[in-house]
């Protein structure tokens, strides 16, 4: 099959029963050890970086209304560019990686992660993204969704440690969850998926997403620059949230990556979380092309 990811098209969904999963198109990449991350020595020189940043800032002049915190992150953060079998091919600013024009015309596929954090009652922590987020503002999504950055600690391929380090960092940044509440060894990378989704006419996502699960009772202190609201939900409460989103009630919207996971994987994986058998669901050799 083609390795080209399909454009996410919003449509009505219903939460599948735990026994109604359909076969999914998948990519079967080589073993992760065969994908050697691009060394940090390929970074541009400081002078080249300065020129590139100046050009990018000039291109972004029309975005003067962008929130200052989000603007800084857009230009300071460097995403990890990958190919469709998750081999590192370079790095690019978060700004360029999320411009829909560049996504459609060039290789802006980048590595990402999405965290599903459950408490000891097996309730899932959701967040509503802040109104100032550049992509998908005010949508409800799973616990934390972001990117590992092009830095040594987040490029570590062995045991997916780089991605787990990034998840710990962003749980603190977005939700104020202390690192000691979410030890990196407690994250379970369950699988990976590749998807593309527009946010509006200008911004969008094209990600190779690591799906990370963790069961911990944590302290939460949301960062208002990142998060508008939070809630824990059980299965029935999630079904009601999906119903409202499908019906367009209360202006409620869900992120496309969260919806893809809900409709394709979450009920079965939630079963494993409750039974303490999540390791049986792990498949990190497959990339689901959704």
Swiss-Prot record:
Keywords: Chlorophyll biosynthesis, Isomerase, Isoprene biosynthesis, Photosynthesis
Annotated GO CC locations: cytoplasm
GO biological process: chlorophyll biosynthetic process; dimethylallyl diphosphate biosynthetic process; isopentenyl diphosphate biosynthetic process; photosynthesis
InterPro entries: IsopentenylPP_isomerase_typ1, NUDIX_hydrolase-like_dom_sf, NUDIX_hydrolase_dom
Enzyme class: isomerase
The Nudix hydrolase domain, residue ranges: 108-260
Pfam families: NUDIX (PF00293)
Pathway where it operates: Isoprenoid biosynthesis; dimethylallyl diphosphate biosynthesis; dimethylallyl diphosphate from isopentenyl diphosphate: step 1/1; Porphyrin-containing compound metabolism; chlorophyll biosynthesis
E.C. number: 5.3.3.2
Active site: 145, 207
Function: Catalyzes the 1,3-allylic rearrangement of the homoallylic substrate isopentenyl (IPP) to its highly electrophilic allylic isomer, dimethylallyl diphosphate (DMAPP).
Protein name in UniProt: Isopentenyl-diphosphate Delta-isomerase II
Organism: Clarkia xantiana (Gunsight clarkia)
Gene (name only): IPI2
